[in-house]
A protein has these predicted regions:
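Helix-start (N-cap) detector for alpha-helical repeat units in TPR-like alpha-solenoids
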Residues: 44-46, 79-80, 113-114, 147-148, ...
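Alpha-helical segment of the N-proximal tetratricopeptide repeat
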Residues: 44-80, 87, 91
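Bacterial N-terminal signal peptides
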Residues: 24-33
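Structural signature of tandem alpha-helical TPR/SEL1-like repeats
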Residues: 57-70, 91-104, 114, 125-138, ...
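Short, low-complexity, charge-dense intrinsically disordered segments
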Residues: 4, 8-19, 26
Length: 215
């Protein structure tokens, strides 16, 4: 009798243990499936973003726009997608929509230097020079060698006729990325405006050679 009770108790223990093991396995499987699904979704979105970027580069902005909108619908916390969507809006001169998308990107990642640079550049295009300066400087705060932010800040100061500041940031942009042809052009224009014709000629010559080489 005593042995039967022990056997019965062992059976219950084994059954409970088995249930716990099965529950644990199911939990692990759910985690793996969820993780794999999430990774698969992210991979698909990355491929779609790459494809949309190629479409935009080819001038097919409306097609690119549809893809980026779909990605942001599927993955609303994808700050890269919101940034890329804003870039297409900007290229199609839908500036208010572009601003909103950049702001969304930055609400998700406030230190994302690309969006900070891009929204700063857009504000410069729209003539909002104070806001442009604020965002471009923030971009450089988080990514000190970001050549595009330095060049855009240099161009902003050029537009404001603050030539010394413009020269400082344009030269910095070239240190960080020596192949920035536009920086040479702007430096040449500053030299020309300040009467340094020979220096201007040299910069324009470098700019011209770079443009021809890139064709």
């Amino acid at each position: 009798m005593k042995n039967q009770k022990i056997t019965h108790l062992q059976t219950r223990i084994n059954t409970n243990s088995l249930r716990k093991i099965i529950a644990c396995i199911i939990g692990i499987v759910v985690i793996i499936v969820t993780t794999n699904s999430s990774l698969a979704g992210k991979t698909e979105n990355n491929l779609l973003m790459h494809h949309a970027a190629k479409l935009s580069k080819a001038g097919k902005n409306e097609e690119a726009l549809k893809i980026f909108l779909e990605i942001t619908r599927r993955d609303p916390e994808n700050f890269y997608a919101h940034n890329n969507l804003a870039m297409v809006y900007s290229q199609t001169k839908k500036y208010n929509k572009a601003l909103k998308s950049y702001e969304k990107s930055l609400s998700l990642n406030p230190t994302f230097s690309m969006s900070l640079n891009n929204i700063g550049n857009l504000h410069m295009t729209m003539g909002h020079y104070d806001k442009a300066e604020e965002y471009l400087k923030k971009s450089l705060t988080y990514f000190k060698t970001f050549h595009l932010a330095s060049m855009n800040l240099g161009e902003l100061y050029f537009k404001k006729k603050q030539y010394d500041d413009a020269m400082k940031y344009l030269k910095k942009a070239l240190i960080d990325m020596p192949t920035l042809s536009r920086a040479h052009k702007l430096i040449g224009e500053i030299h020309y405006l300040q009467g340094r014709k020979e220096e201007a000629r040299k910069e324009f010559s470098i700019y011209k050679k770079m443009i021809e080489k890139s064709k």
